Amino acid sequence: MAYAPIIIKEPKVLSEDQGRCRRLRIGLGARVYSNRLFEEIAHFFDVHPEIEVTFVTEAGQDFFVPMREGKLDVAIDRLPPVQLIPDRGGFVSWPLIRERQCILMAESDPRSRLTGMTFQDLQGCAVITGLENSMEDRTLKQECRDFGVTLNRIYRSDGIETDMKLLRKGMGVIIGPESFADYYHVAAVPLVPEVMVSLDFICLKKNANRPEIAALRKQLAKVCKEKAPCE
């Protein structure tokens, strides 16, 4: 009896039939772009056309609420302070890239020549952050409470480009990652004592083993290990 040859193909994350009704909604923090990671994310979906993707990129967005409500599947962003995440036990996260947290300022700012600044050095300063009650804004307020710092003024916006224009004009400073300096052409003075913050892959625990989520996480972990291994 003759048998048909067996052809083995590289499996897709999802079958074509599943892919037509399967969507992946991803929240992206600004650190994704400053660490040149968006190109890798886009490439993943280029080779997996069976997954329909939507990106949410609002600056300072609280991604945890829409994930909990089932409106978002994954967030790739920094983790906020523990006390700002209710029901944190329902989420799981994996660090992708770790970098120093800095005080960002205009390159013309005299303080840009310093080798380090403490959070207390922000006393009486103007700071640029996200919209009121956004995760970015609440994180700033929490840090000010923790260090007993009173700011002189706060500028808020919902766009990172607006934030950076304010920064370059010397209107205030931003607390952010070291990678912003090169990406946005601003100065970065490291916080002292050193504060390391990671860009994390975050999702609900119950969704962690979904094939498309697991595949994306593993691919990004591989890429980031080559870029800047997490210790």
Model-derived features with residue positions:
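Alpha-helical "hinge/linker" immediately C-terminal to small N-terminal DNA-binding modules
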Residues: M1-Q18, D77
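N-terminal winged-helix
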Residues: Y3, D17-H48, E52-V65, P211
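Flexible hinge/capping segments at coil-to-helix
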Residues: Q18, R88-Q101, M105-V127, P211
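Secondary-structure junction motif
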Residues: N35-L37, R78, C125-F147, N209-R210, ...
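A late-sequence structural motif
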Residues: R36, P190-E231
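Short beta-strand-centered segments that line the small-molecule binding cleft or hinge
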Residues: E39-H43, Q61-Q101, M105, H185-V189
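Hydrophobic hinge/microswitch elements
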Residues: A59, R68-L72, R78, N133-A187
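Beta-alpha-beta core module
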Residues: I85-W94, E99, E161-A208
